[in-house]
């Protein structure tokens, strides 16, 4: 399962899957023992029928995550697999759903984070590792400033459309341990290590 060691707190929790699509993350969360998953997507009729009929899944189709102020349950973890939008837009919204030490596992998709110039160079495929580094620095620095701590960063085992390299990050909200300088130093170490191991 893609979450690996990041999945320890999923069991018996209420979770949100932003950009649920056919339900890849939703299915993983249920297999790990999630009590309830809110499957949020702007599309309609995409979620797999098995998940659509699972009583643990709350189907929220035709729903833009940016318009959700809160959920009726205390949310322990949010997964994000969103396209055509930057995490820098979604994180402030997601932050409003969370309590202290809630978690976020999000895909960072360089093709949707890069500026038009960088995205246009490869017809939507980001191959330049310097661009990857710049995007990771921008997105994760933004997360730090939004009071998230960075607990993990890896290359996603699955590539995006057209072979785009994507990254999985593990964030916790408002842990408040360590100075901001220490957190930025740790961020830089994590980014460099991840990029060294790109496949």
Give the role of each language-model region.
Residues 1-11:
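Single conserved hydrophobic/aromatic residue that forms the stacking wall/gate
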Residues 13-21:
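Conserved class I S-adenosyl-L-methionine
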Residues 22-33:
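Conserved SAM-binding loop of SAM-dependent methyltransferases across substrates and taxa
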Residues 35-89:
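S-adenosyl-L-methionine
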Residues 88-105:
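A short glycine-rich, Lys/Arg-flanked "PGG" loop and its adjoining helix->strand segment in the class I
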Residues 110-127:
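Short, glycine-/aromatic-enriched active-site segment of Class I SAM-dependent methyltransferases
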Residues 132-146:
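Short alpha-helix
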Residues 165, 169-199:
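Flexible, glycine-/basic-rich loop-and-beta segments that form/coincide
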């Amino acid at each position: 399962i893609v979450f690996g060691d990041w999945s320890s707190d999923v069991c018996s929790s209420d979770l949100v899957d932003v950009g649920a699509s056919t339900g890849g993350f939703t299915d993983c969360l249920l297999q790990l023992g999630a009590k309830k998953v809110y499957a949020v997507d702007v599309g309609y009729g995409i979620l797999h029928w098995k998940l659509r009929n699972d009583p643990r899944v709350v189907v929220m189709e035709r729903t833009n995550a940016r318009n959700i102020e809160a959920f009726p349950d205390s949310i322990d973890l949010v997964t994000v697999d969103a396209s055509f939008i930057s995490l820098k837009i979604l994180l402030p919204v997601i932050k409003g759903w969370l309590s202290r030490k809630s978690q976020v596992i999000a895909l960072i998709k360089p093709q949707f984070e890069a500026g038009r110039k960088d995205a246009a160079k490869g017809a939507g495929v980001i191959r330049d590792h310097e661009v990857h580094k710049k995007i990771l620095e921008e997105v994760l620095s933004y997360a730090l400033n939004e009071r998230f701590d960075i607990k993990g960063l890896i290359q996603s085992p699955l590539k995006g459309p057209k072979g785009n390299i994507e990254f999985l990050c593990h964030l916790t909200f408002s842990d408040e341990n360590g100075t901001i300088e220490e957190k930025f130093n740790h961020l830089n170490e994590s980014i460099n290590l991840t990029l060294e191991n790109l496949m």
